[in-house]
Each structure stands twice: as C-alpha cells, then as structure tokens.
Amino acid sequence: MITLITEQLQKQTLDELKCTRFSVSLPLPDHADIPNCGDPFQLVSEGASWRGLPHCSCAEFQDSLNFSYHPSGLSLHLRPPSRGNSPKEPPLSQVLSPEPPDPEKLPVPPAPPSKRHCRSLSVPVDLSRWQPVWRPAPSKLWTPIKHRGNAGGGGPQVPQQSPPKRVSSLRFLQAPSASSQCAPAHRPYSPPFFSLALAQDSAQPCATSPQSGSWESDAESLSPCPPQRRFSLSPSLGPQASRFLPSARSSPASSPELPWRPRGLRNLPRSRSQPCDLDARKTGVKRRHEEDCRRLRPSLDFDKMNQKPYSGGLCLQETAREEGSNVSPPWFMACSPPPLSASCSPVEGSSQVLSESEEEEEGSVRWERQALSKRTLCQQDFGDLDLNLIEEN
C-alpha cells in the first residue's frame, strides 16, 4: 500500500496537485478482468484517479456531463478528457461550474397588481408558475377591462399583448382535468388545490404521461413556464376567450348558447350578469307571509277586569251602621271621596286618641277594623277574570 502511494505521488507534478483530499475506491472482484482495473484496495487522489489508473473495460453508464458509474466499485469515477479527439474541450472545472444566467433568457417578473386588484391574495413565486385549465366564464361583472374593451366594441380599445410564439411540439397524452397543470420537468408532484384559482395570461397546452404521471414537453422541458398573474377576484381569460364572451350589446336572443350547458337546461332564460340556470325563480323577491295567515293578537279587556268594586266595602258600611257609631266610613269606600284632612283619613277609625278606660273595650273592635281595611285594599275578586285571555297575551 505504501509503495503504491509513493509511486503515484512521484508521477504527479506540482501543477496537477490541486486537491489534496483522497477518496477510497474499492472495486469488487466480481469480473475476470481484475488486473486491468488495478488493485482492489488502493488510495487514489481525486485529481489523478483517471490518469494514474488504467482504464477499466467494464460496462459504464454515461450521462450528458461525462459522469461514468463503475458497476463493480463503491465510488463514482470521472472519465478523463480525451486530448486527441477533442482538443477544444473545456476543462472539468469549467464544465461543472454553473453557467452565468443570460439576462435575455430570464423570465420577466409579473407586473404589480393594479388598484382594481388590491384585494388579491399573495402567492409564493414558485406557485405562480402553475397554469390552470382555462374554462370560459361569460360573466361581464368580473371580466378585466382589456377583454371587456375588445369584446364590447364601444369602449376604448386597449392593445392586448399576445404571448410570444414558441416552436415546440407538445404531445397531449391525457385529457385535461381540473387538477392538470403545467409544471416544469423537475416537479413530478401534482399542483396544490389553490392553484386552480390562479389566473392565466397565456393558455399553453400541457402534456403528461399516464404511466409515470410526470409532465413532459419536447422543447421546453428545462425552461420554466411563463410568469402568471397572482390570485385575483377577477379571472383573467386567455386570448382565445374573446369568442366565448358575450359582448356588451348582446342579448340572450342574439348571443349563442354556450357549449358547456346541459342539453336539458338550454331553454331556460339566461341571466345578464351571471351564468345561472335557475333564473326562472325570482330569488331577489322576498317571500312575505300572506295576510290571511297572520293571526291578530287578542287585546286586553280592562272594563271586564274592573267591573266589580272592592269586595267587603258594603260589608264594612253595614257593620258601621249596625254598630251605630259616629265614625264615617273610610274615604276609599265613599262614592265621592272628600279631600284628605285630619277628620277624614284612611286610618281614622284606628288612629283616634282614646282614653285609658275606653282602650280596653275598643281594643278588639279596632283590630278587626284594621284587618278589614287591609283586606279591602289588598284583596280583590278575580273570579270573573278571563285567565285564558291573560295567558294568551
């Protein structure tokens, strides 16, 4: 091992020693041409791995960047540049170095949204490359101004920039669906669900293979898709969408029926603003209750509730007359109550100043009159009240 390393270091010059790192190359002895491929256990430098060792005659897999894979080894070997066949071939460091981007080939960044699209949602730059499948929408409310001016004919004509023509042959291997988007070749996964709402400035067909599920394009497999508009409430239609849009002067009778409507619903009247097939129902009219169904609330009959006087009033007057006392009946029992004074008060019968001799005799009568007067104030006869009428109210 040491002798092999010293011999290889002696063969190298000072100009070739650009990298001092070493890699272990362990080719497995699974073929008969072992001595031609070198010692199975050896340490070789990365700069001299293809010059110091003889070339092996085993099968190699080569790609576009001159990388060859040794099937019987545990490492990747770089093929040496052939000096006789291609004298103008650049060195390996220039081949592997990334090329500076051409400013003409860079995609133009999307223009900032106008004031009309201030409410548009923000989308990352990577997601703005997805192209949704365009479906015509005949709505005249949310159509952008440039398409409305071209379709109506009456407004100012805004010049519409057509996308650049690209010479590329695209195979359409699968019918487009709602989830089929145009993606670069290095994105094999399906686009996210909210990419369907991305507006589209230029309609470009996509191709996909049903076996692998990857998107392919013959001429534009490495070039990114053109920059698209971000999320917006107003859909931006493709350049070929003007023939589906009804003009501003069109009427339901003059404009043709759209092809995506069901056959059974083509005779329904069309809406002027939105393509709704249920315009026969007047959805804008409020459904009010009929007058017959409305039941009138029962009113309170206060005359019926107050048709009887206080109970016990007549009994109080009769008891006062039977006793023969000079005490007048209380003010609330008289038909025409006199003004309140010291001689005519509600509690006159109970608040008179009595002597000590008469206090014991009049004690029982006084308490009875107080209890009776309280009953007349608080108690009423609710027998004739209509309780059902009160509960309904």
Curated annotation (Swiss-Prot):
Residues carrying N-acetylmethionine: M1
Residue ranges with Low complexity bias: 241-256, 343-355
Highest taxon listed in the record's lineage: Eukaryota
Biased composition (Polar residues): 204-215
Phosphoserine found at: S122, S162, S232, S234, S255, S273, S299
Keyword Phosphoprotein: yes
InterPro entries: FAM53
Keywords assigned: Acetylation, Phosphoprotein
Region Disordered, annotated ranges: 77-120, 141-167, 204-283, 343-365
Keyword Protein biosynthesis: no
Family: Belongs to the FAM53 family.
Name of this protein: Protein FAM53C
